[in-house]
Curated annotation (Swiss-Prot):
Belongs to the peptidase C2 family. This is Calpain-15. The active site is at C562, H727, N747. Its EC number is 3.4.22.-. It comes from Mus musculus.
Length: 1095
């Protein structure tokens, strides 16, 4: 047990005293090496260190800039640069021995100098010494660190060249001399080395030159200098599989990777011949004999390259004789703490074979795949300078994008296949080695095969947390600004202005028909400094994105998009919200702007240019802002780009504009009873007033639609009261003063105010209320109105619930066109009691080029849920739901306790079942027109919560949709007891159609039910027919039919007649011509929804 103050060594776990800075056993430093410092050294400029003061000077300096020391260069040898903190080794040059009367070691190999005999006249015992490689460094350590003051030493861990006086490495802290226990060479495992991405690869050292091959013997008078050669070593690509540079990087290995079975250590008496080095003429006979043996090997063609340094454990290893690989016969020399690996033919790489990148087996060049693991040759042998000529998907031998069988362009981020191509083989998840089917453990890292089976059967985790609204906005803006800065930098470098090629300035972006007057008036697209200002007083005002924006700044153009401008005016009551929409908030000289909008429930940052449609005189034709502000025109152009054209922005409701601009949940409160469906529930004016009061206290945005929708409007009567029909107003304040319910409204136009009761000029104002409600007098376009008049002349109130401190999560899905498709359900996990808002958006509902652009009957259902074994979903009690409506989006809100919930999104008026037999009759304006789209329509479920929640899209059972509809109808529908043991449930009012569910509680009798809805109009049936006959088994219930409103703008009518009888058999007998139990038959397209379900 460690005492107080002792510290454990991170390398050998030895307990050292508190005052000890290095480990007493392995001399490792107490603190871990600074990785940042090592990385900085790896990219340091090429410099040479001063031998006197250790200052690092640039290569061009002949003397030290600090102390003035001038190194003595070797004649004819250039000063070696230090690259990446490592002193590179010059080419090894072999020189034939001169003189026969002196005892010499023959040709020897050094790392920085050609070793020759001493110069004549020099005292015996002196010799020229230079910095040499690992062999000399090893020898210096064994001889008591005998090094000259200016030589220095190379760190054996990180190869940094250190000063002679340093006792430990200045980069990694490694000791100069190691004192670790010896480990036999058999315990060392050398893995395959791959160069790390992003690091510079030092070119490989030159190959040795044999005597007689370009290196001639020097005369005695010139033997003092280094010998030069004219032969150029063979060039190997830096990142080639055969590059020795990539294969000679030191790779540290942990101790746990040493195999458990070790052979007896080699006796220290056996010395490696490769570790011999020249020490001059004072070498003994033993070294001379070793040198002679070395020379014989070189002359016989068995030359050795400078050993590559693969230090796998920082421990001293006893020297042993060189061994050879059993597979390729390459020389593997274990000496000291160094493992030298020498290929059999390093100077001439073998291009007749290629190494498999998966299992490292060498295959013949003619083989396209590995004979063992089936790995592709392209991944194991390919020059990096040549682009790939094979398609990764179809294998076509064509350069560039594939236009053959697959027709796909190569992806920049291709997923790596970790699973083997051949059946039975398995890839280790730890080291990716391909193993044989019989192997229970990985041959490299001993990972069990059971782990692979578990990983293969696991499904990817799709559960995610909700994100804070403000954090999401900041994240989106950060990503968008990075793109914007690149575009602006490119435009500045090339002196051009940005032009958006995805929404070009042309007729297609305007989008109106060819003969339309609006299309003909667009003559040119101009930038702000080229546009003529229509207001004379604004001529001297410079252009800007914002200039103290006001709602009255908005001016509508030729487009019929007042729904969007009304929402923009409501948003302008809070200038900070408008600034959040504009990501680029200042004028851009290059003309690139970004706008953040929420289209169909999904946040999108839109990039646009500042080229705006103008007439021949240079005046703007579409929406604009006064005082030369660009925010209105840029937001409108971004919205037009999202939906395809300016033409697509025509017609809409202000609530859609609020949802697009804010991304917040929006709710519309109807003030009038629907004229298309008089049987709708009556309007509760007290409930609406309470909601408006609470919304004002919460700081929500509110807008009101005047004289539109379901109302019959007399334009003259409205204008006489100062109102503008089919126009949106902003609700500024809601007050309950002395029993009077008052609202303060603003006309975005800044003119035309209400002149009825409680108006500015109304003579019956109480004095104290006038001073309280209008302290600054009247202003143009702003007025007070009594709530009863508001109900009479306005159609609806739109509430935008902007929460700056809420969480949000958005889940994409699709509406299946039949019950046979997958039923998407969103699993919701509530961690603490929270208030939640749900909004369901239909994707692509505004685009005019969509194949199936009609609106769907959207509905949201929220249930308690339980997940059984295997994640099987079971629905519980219905907690909340939206009304089923043919709109662009619907919403609902609920307060939930901690637990598991399921959110079901459904729509039915796009179903196109094809029952067998003759075509079924459809009572709808578009009968006979195929409505089925190639792909099911998509949707986005937006979840807003006051606390953190978890959402996860899950795939439910095919019968989950039937269970959800049955629970909804039983909970909210009308109950009718037709006979004993039979109950019918109807859901019609406020549900954009009809849902009929029948329950048979008889234990033995069948229930035959016939439902006739042939007199209905503008509805479509999920059964493909308006007349159905079904046999409900005992103790079962069934969804007989779902009728859905087809066209949202047109009225619909539903008439249904129900006939039922008890029967002892399941067949319908005389009700159908065939012996069937359902008519139309329950095909797989509808069985999941309309099949009988047990009670």
């Amino acid at each position: 047990m460690a005492t107080v103050g002792e510290w454990s060594c991170a390398r050998c776990t030895f307990l050292n005293p508190a005052g000890q800075r290095q480990c007493s056993i392995c001399e490792a430093p107490r603190h871990k090496p600074d990785l940042d410092q090592i990385l900085r050294l790896s990219v340091e400029e090429q410099k040479w260190p001063c031998a006197r003061c250790t200052f690092r000077n640039f290569l061009g300096k002949e003397a030290c800039e600090v102390c003035g020391f001038t190194p003595e260069p070797v004649p004819g040898a250039p000063l070696l640069p230090i690259i990446n903190g490592v002193l590179p080794k010059p080419p090894t040059i072999l020189v034939e021995p001169k003189g026969s009367g002196k005892e010499e070691a023959g040709p020897v190999r050094t790392a920085g100098l050609v070793a020759t005999e001493p110069a004549r006249g020099r005292p015996e015992g002196e010799e020229e010494r230079e910095e040499r490689g690992e062999e000399e460094e090893k020898e210096q350590e064994g001889e008591g660190e005998r090094a000259e003051p200016g030589s220095g030493w190379a760190c054996q861990r990180c190869t940094l060249h250190n000063t002679p006086v340093a006792s430990s490495c200045s980069a990694c802290g490694g000791p100069r001399k190691l004192s670790l226990p010896r480990i036999p060479p058999e315990a060392l495992v050398v893995p395959e080395v791959v160069a790390p991405t992003g690091f510079h690869v030092v070119p490989a050292p030159s190959q040795p030159v044999l005597p007689g091959e370009g290196a001639e013997a020097d005369s005695p008078s010139t033997s003092q200098g280094p010998t030069s050669t004219d032969q150029e070593p063979p060039r190997v690509p830096l990142f080639s599989p055969f590059s020795p540079t990539l294969q000679n990087n030191p790779v540290p290995r942990s101790r746990r990777e040493v195999p458990p079975q070790l052979q007896p250590p080699v006796p220290e008496a056996v010395q490696s011949s490769a570790s011999t080095s020249s020490k001059g003429p004072q070498q003994g006979p033993g070294r001379a004999a070793a040198g002679a043996s070395r020379l014989a090997e070189l002359l016989s063609g068995k030359e050795l390259l400078p050993g590559k340094r693969l230090s796998v454990l920082e421990e001293e290893v006893p020297e042993s004789s060189p061994a050879r690989c059993e597979s390729c016969s390459d020389v593997i020399d274990l000496a000291g703490d160094i493992v030298r690996y020498t290929p059999a033919s390093p100077s001439s790489p073998d291009f007749t074979t290629w190494s498999c990148a998966r299992c490292t087996l060498r295959n013949p060049t003619t083989a396209p795949r590995c004979s063992v693991c089936g790995g592709s040759k392209l991944h194991g042998f390919q020059e990096h300078s040549e682009p790939p000529t094979h398609c990764p998907d179809c294998g076509a031998n064509k350069p560039g994008p594939c236009v053959g069988s697959c027709g796909r362009a190569p992806s920049a981020h291709k997923a790596v296949r970790l699973l083997p191509d051949r059946p039975g083989q398995w890839a280790c998840p730890a080291c990716t080695l391909i193993n044989t089917p019989r192997a229970k453990h990985c041959a490299a890292c001993h990972t069990p095969q059971l782990l692979v089976t578990q990983c293969r059967g696991a499904t990817p985790l799709r559960r995610r947390e909700s994100m804070h609204v403000e954090k999401r906005r900041q994240t989106d803006e950060g990503e968008a600004k990075a793109l914007w800065e690149n575009i602006v930098a490119f435009c500045r470098e090339n002196s051009v202005n940005f032009v958006d090629d995805s929404f070009p300035p042309g007729p297609a972006s305007v989008g109106f028909p060819v003969g339309d007057s609006v299309q003909q008036r667009v003559k040119q697209w101009l930038r702000p400094h080229e546009i003529n200002c229509s207001v004379f007083r604004d001529h001297g005002t410079p252009w800007s994105v914002f200039h103290t924006l006001r709602p009255s700044d908005i001016l509508q153009g030729l487009l019929g998009n007042c729904w969007f401008l009304s929402a923009l005016a409501v948003l302008a009551e809070r200038p900070d919200l408008v600034e959040r929409v504009m990501v680029t908030r200042s004028l851009c000289a290059e003309g690139a702007y970004q706008v953040r909008l929420c289209k169909d429930g999904t946040w999108t940052t839109v990039l646009v240019d500042d080229m705006l449609p103008c007439d021949e005189a240079g005046f703007l034709l579409f929406s604009q802002a006064q005082r030369k502000q660009l925010w209105v025109a840029l937001i409108e152009k971004a919205l037009a780009k999202l939906h395809g054209s300016y033409f697509a922005l025509q017609a809409g409701r202000a609530i859609e504009g609020l949802a697009t601009l804010t991304g917040a949940p929006c709710e519309s409160l109807a003030l009038q009873v629907s004229s298309t469906n008089p049987r709708e529930e009556p309007v509760d004016t007290d409930l609406i007033w309470a909601k408006m009061l609470s919304s004002k206290e919460a700081g929500f945005l509110m807008g009101a639609s005047c004289g539109g929708g379901n109302m019959k409007v007399d334009d003259a009567a409205y204008e006489s009261l100062g109102l503008r029909p089919r126009h949106a107003y902003s609700v500024l304040d809601v007050r309950d003063v002395q029993g009077s319910r008052l609202l303060r409204l603003r006309n975005p136009w800044g003119r035309f105010s209400w002149n009825g009761s409680w108006s500015d000029e109304w003579p019956h104002w109480p004095g104290h209320l006038r001073a309280e409600l209008m302290p600054h007098g009247s202003s143009e376009g702003v007025f007070w109105m009594e709530y009863s008049d508001f109900i009479r002349y306005f159609d609806s109130v739109d509430i935008c619930k902007v929460h700056s401190d809420w969480q949000e999560a958005r889940v994409q899905g699709c509406f299946p066109s039949t019950a046979g498709g997958p039923v998407g359900v969103t699993a919701l996990t509530v961690l603490e009691r929270a208030s939640l808002e749900f909004a369901l958006f239909q994707e692509g509902s505004r685009r005019s080029d969509s194949v199936d652009s009609h609106l769907l009957d959207l509905c949201i259902l929220v249930f308690r849920a339980t997940f059984g074994t295997g994640g099987r979903l079971s629905l519980g009690r219905l907690l909340a739901h939206s009304k089923r409506a043919v709109k662009k989006f619907v919403n609902c809100d609920v307060m939930l306790e901690p637990g598991e919930y399921a959110v079901v999104c459904c729509a039915f008026n796009h179903w196109n079942p094809a029952p067998p037999g003759p075509p079924a009759q459809a009572s709808s304006p578009s009968a006979g027109v195929p409505r089925g789209a190639p792909e099911p329509p998509g949707h986005v479920l937006a979840v807003y919560s006051s606390r953190l929640v978890m959402v996860e899209p899950v795939e439910a059972q095919p019968t989950t949709l039937a269970d959800a509809i049955i629970l909804l109808t039983e909970s909210r529908g009308e109950r009718h007891e037709g006979r004993e043991g039979m109950t019918c449930y109807y859901l019609t009012h406020g549900w954009a159609g009809l849902i009929v569910v029948v329950e048979n509680r008889h234990p033995k009798s069948y229930l035959h039910v016939q439902c006739d809805c042939t007199d209905s109009f503008n509805v479509v049936s999920t059964r493909g027919s308006l007349r159905t006959q079904d046999s409900v088994p005992p103790l079962h219930r069934q969804v007989l039919v779902i009728l859905s409103q087809l066209e949202g703008n047109a009225g619909f009518s539903i008439t249904h007649r129900l006939a039922h009888r008890k029967a002892a058999q399941a067949f319908l007998s005389d009700w159908t011509a065939s012996r069937g139990t359902h008519s139309p038959p329950l095909t797989p397209d509808v069985a999941g929804l309309h099949g009988p379900r047990p009670l």
